[in-house]
Amino acid sequence: MKDLAEYKNEIHSCSKCGLCQSVCPIYEVTKNDCSVSRGMFIMLKGLLKGELKMSKKLNRYLDLCLKCGACTKFCPSGINIVDIIASAKAKYFQSHPMEKFISFIQSKLIFGLGIKTLGLFSKNITSQKFDKKVIYFGGCGGNLKGNKSVISILNACDIEVITPLFDCCGIPFYVRGDKNSFEKAKQKFINLIEKYNTREIVTTCASCEKTLKSYNIDGLIVKNIFEYIREQNLKLKLKKKIRATFHKPCNIENYNDIEWILNNTENLEYIQMKNFDKCCGLNEIFKLSDYKILSKIPKEKHNNIRQTNVKTVLTSCLGCEAALSLYSFGKYKVCDLTEFLAKNITQ
C-alpha cells in the first residue's frame, strides 16, 4: 500500500468531469459532492498542501466510500480511486489510537477463524491421477465452510487440490487503512505458498481473488474456480429444476465465466435481477451513524431480488453473501455459487 503523497499526481490529474457522480451508489443516496471521488480529491488536495487536517469529519467522508470501484471503471483519466481512498484511510489510521484498537480486535477475530470444522473438510479422490495441481485459497470463508465443494468440482475438472489452512487475505485491513496488518496478512500468505511446488492459486471469493492479485507476486497465477469449469467445458446438470438470480460482486474481474455457467447449467433457470451488478452496500451496513441514509443501498438490492420472484440468490463473494443474507428476511436463500453447484449437480 502506497503512502497518500505518492498519489499526488493522480489526485491532481482529476479533471472534475463529474462522471463519478453518475455511477457512485453513495452519491445517488446522499447527493453530497464530498461523498464522491471528485469532492474527496478536492479535500485530499487540501490535505497534501497542508490546508486541511486529517480530521474525523474528513475521515467520515472517506468511510462512506463502498470501495466498489464503479468510479474507477468510469474515470476517463484512469485513476485508481479505491487505492487512493485506502491510502488516505491509512493516513488517518496512523494518528488515531482508537482505529488501531478496533483493528486489533478485528484481526483477532479474523485470524481466529483458522479452525477446521469437523465434517467440512475432505481430500482429493485417491483413486484418480490428475493432470494438474493447484492450491486452494479458502481464506476466512474456506476455514469456516470447508473445502468439500471446491475439491469435488476441481477433481471433476481433472485437477488435484492442495488445501493449506490460510488466514484472511487482508482486504478488511486494506479498506480500513491498517497498512501493517495488511502487509502481515500478505507475508503470511507468501510464507505458506513457498512450501509448495505449484504457483497456481484458485479461490471462490471475488474479493480474495482481487486482493491476492494485488500482491503482485512474480510467477503467481490467481484464478477463480469458474475459469477452470469453463476451460474444461464441465457439463453441469442440476438434480432438479431451480430458479435463481445472481448478484455480481464489485470485485469480480471475469464475469464471463460465471455468465457462461449460469446460462449453460441444465435445469437452472437464471433470472437476471435489475442492477444485478450494483454494489450490495456491505461496507456501509454497520455504520450506524449514517444508517438511515446508507441502508437504502442494501434495501434497494433486496427489492430488486424480490421482483424476480426467486427463492435462491447466488453470488461469489463471502462479504456479499453475508450482506445479502442480512437483508433477506427469510424471503430467499443466499448461496455461494460454488457450494450451490457442488450440492445440486448430478455426479
Q: What is each model feature region?
A:
Residues N9-Y27, N59-I79, P249-N251, D277-K278:
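Cysteine-centered iron-sulfur cluster-binding motifs in ferredoxin-type domains/subunits
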Residues F41-N216:
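Iron-sulfur-cluster electron-transfer modules
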Residues M1-R60:
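N-terminal cysteine/histidine-rich coordination modules
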Residues I225, E231-T265:
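C-terminal amphipathic alpha-helical segment
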Residues V134-Y136, R243-A244, V313:
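Conserved hydrophobic helix-helix packing surfaces used for dimerization/oligomerization
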